[in-house]
Amino acid sequence: MSKEGVSFKNRDRFIQLGIAISTLRKLRGMSQDQLAEKANMSRSHLSAIEAPNMIRSFSLETLFNLADALMITPSDLLNTSL
């Protein structure tokens, strides 16, 4: 595992999820600051999740908060293919 706790096997999944979050945020006309505030997290943490070159694992609570803030179900967020 890497220092962020993401195994190589899951690396691409976290990259895809970060890209999906970023794309949905932009489609909704939200800045990182706005989404981070609605999802109860720091902008720097959100930025790290969205960045494809910084693989960052995160909790289910964070996933649920992001999904709620993006007005999408967690399962739809996980199944988003953008």
Task: List each model region and its residues.
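A short, Lys/Arg-rich alpha-helix, primarily the initiator
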Residues: 2-27
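Conserved hydrophobic/aromatic packing and binding residues within compact polymer-binding modules
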Residues: 21, 35-36, 46-49, 77
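Residues within the helices of the helix-turn-helix
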Residues: 22, 33, 64
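The alpha-helix within a helix-turn-helix
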Residues: 25, 36, 67
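Recognition helix of helix-turn-helix/homeodomain-like DNA-binding domains
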Residues: 40-56
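Short, basic-rich loop-to-helix N-cap that marks the start of a DNA-contacting helix
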Residues: 53-68
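Short C-terminal boundary/hinge segments that cap the last helix of small helical domains
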Residues: 71-82
